[in-house]
């Protein structure tokens, strides 16, 4: 008989069993397959079919799987007793344990028995002893592997595992032969050690991906690694998982820029508070603060590490006075479009915001005054991107200081309609600033470079600084410099 005489899935079951129970060779009844009426009765975990070995194979330990005819009666009284199969079990057998089980797929009754013979027995003799009982269908006989206590305990555990035992009487008790030389019992610690198998490479990859995906994409890699002991063990030194996490932002839904608001005026009047409240409100669904405050000290970088931009919905340009170039500003505030690509330390990212909040102590007319004074038409692209303008005066209408004591006590003036009426006219914006929040003189000239007037009439290059001798120069220095006696 060859491997092709049996279903392929039965062969795969063999591999699983041999790994689980510490059993080596599978030896089956050598009669033709058709003589076994129902191979589906075989337990999906226990029974397997493999090539037949030599009938003269010697074995001292084995696991026997038995099935029973439909006409078999009183199985609990005799089916697990070694005296039912051997004439002199006290001489032939050293240890014998087993139990009845139900196949989880077919619900057929069968039994697993672990046998330790007093001496080596040939396979043909063992097979004939079990086959001689007419009510028995011999499923298979598996040769034991190893003689250590752990190997034997694994085989015993497999045959008397209470999790697989038949749940109903009279089959719900494991059979431990009274003549056993060793009092074997089910060892839970050994079973736990056996079931904790090393995962395959494919399964390990799936576990890592699933664990990474369980964390918010905006978390830093350090936060993920130190979130739990499981994450530490799984991700320690795993650069592939780190690279995978860094690219998760790519699959996030892209936001469209909906609003650009400017809140300007006196300090301490609630401008930054508005930006914070907006970020908190939008973060109610995502579970985090959705406001990112631009740090101009980072230069062209939008942060790094835990301070980098991580997909927040609100970009806050705090204390803004034109620190971003006008071209970059227009990209950040392009209504109806998605955010541009920006640099972050050790990488890059894409802005994915929907709101821009600009807070400043300077009127918008002074943001890019150096550009607009030279080319007033450049003001129009800036003007049309602003959807709301709010002014925070230094004093209340009654003349008292505008110093809100709580978030609800903020006083501001909405100038959006007046802003829209400018129609991109920079001169009108300057007049508006002069009326409400005048620009400082240094604001008007701060963009002027040292040699802007180099070709104007009367321009003179500044003289370089000259070292001035101190009027109280020490006599020793005078002598060292001139060689003359300073006292004469």
Swiss-Prot record:
Its main location: host cell. InterPro entries: Helicase_SF3_ssDNA/RNA_vir, P-loop_NTPase. One of its GO terms (cellular component) is host cell nucleus. Gene3D superfamilies: 3.40.1310.20, P-loop containing nucleotide triphosphate hydrolases. Pfam families: RNA_helicase. It is found in: Host nucleus. Residues 462-488 are annotated as: Disordered. This is Replication-associated protein. It comes from Chaetoceros diatodnavirus 1 (Chaetoceros setoense DNA virus).
């Amino acid at each position: 008989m060859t491997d092709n005489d049996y279903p392929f899935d039965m062969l795969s079951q063999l591999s699983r069993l041999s790994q689980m129970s510490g059993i080596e060779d599978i030896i089956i009844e050598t009669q033709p397959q058709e003589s076994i009426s129902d191979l589906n009765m075989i337990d999906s975990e226990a029974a397997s079919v493999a090539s037949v070995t030599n009938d003269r194979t010697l074995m001292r330990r084995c696991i026997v799987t038995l099935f029973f005819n439909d006409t078999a009666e009183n199985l609990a009284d005799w089916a697990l007793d070694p005296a039912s199969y051997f004439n002199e079990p006290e001489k032939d057998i050293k240890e014998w344990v087993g139990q009845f089980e139900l196949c989880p797929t077919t619900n057929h009754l069968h039994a697993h028995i672990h046998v330790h013979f007093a001496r080596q027995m040939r396979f043909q003799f063992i097979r004939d002893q079990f086959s001689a009982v007419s009510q028995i269908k011999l499923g298979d006989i598996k040769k034991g592997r190893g003689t250590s206590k752990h190997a034997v305990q694994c085989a015993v555990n497999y045959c008397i595992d209470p999790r697989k035992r038949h749940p109903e009487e009279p089959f719900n008790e494991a059979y431990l032969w009274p003549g056993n030389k060793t009092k074997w019992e089910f060892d839970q610690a050994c079973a736990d050690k056996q079931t904790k198998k090393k995962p395959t490479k494919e399964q390990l990859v799936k576990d890592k991906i699933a664990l990474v995906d369980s964390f918010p994409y905006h978390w830093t890699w350090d936060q993920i690694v130190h979130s739990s002991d499981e994450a530490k063990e799984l991700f320690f030194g795993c650069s592939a998982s780190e690279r995978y996490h860094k690219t998760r932002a790519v699959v996030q839904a892209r936001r469209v820029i909906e609003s650009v608001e400017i809140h300007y005026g006196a300090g301490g009047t609630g401008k930054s508070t508005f930006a914070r409240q907006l970020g908190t409100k939008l973060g109610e669904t995502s579970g985090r603060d959705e406001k990112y405050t631009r740090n101009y000290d980072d230069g062209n970088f939008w942060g790094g590490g835990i301070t980098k931009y991580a997909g927040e919905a609100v970009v806050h340009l705090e204390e803004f006075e034109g620190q971003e170039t006008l071209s970059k500003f227009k990209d950040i505030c392009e209504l109806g479009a998605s955010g541009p690509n920006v640099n972050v330390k050790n990488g890059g990212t894409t802005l994915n915001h929907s709101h821009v909040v600009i807070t400043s102590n300077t009127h918008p007319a002074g943001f890019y005054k150096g550009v607009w004074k030279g080319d007033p038409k450049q003001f129009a692209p800036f003007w049309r991107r602003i959807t709301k303008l709010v002014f925070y005066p230094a004093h209340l209408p009654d003349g008292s200081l505008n110093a809100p004591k709580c978030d609800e006590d903020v006083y501001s003036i909405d100038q959006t309609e007046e802003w829209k009426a400018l129609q991109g006219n920079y001169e009108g914006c300057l007049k508006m600033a002069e009326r409400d929040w005048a620009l400082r003189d240094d604001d008007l000239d701060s963009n002027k470079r040292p040699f802007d007037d180099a070709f104007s009439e009367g321009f003179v290059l500044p003289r370089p600084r000259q070292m001035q001798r101190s009027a109280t120069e020490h006599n020793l220095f005078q002598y060292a410099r001139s060689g003359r006696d300073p006292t004469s």
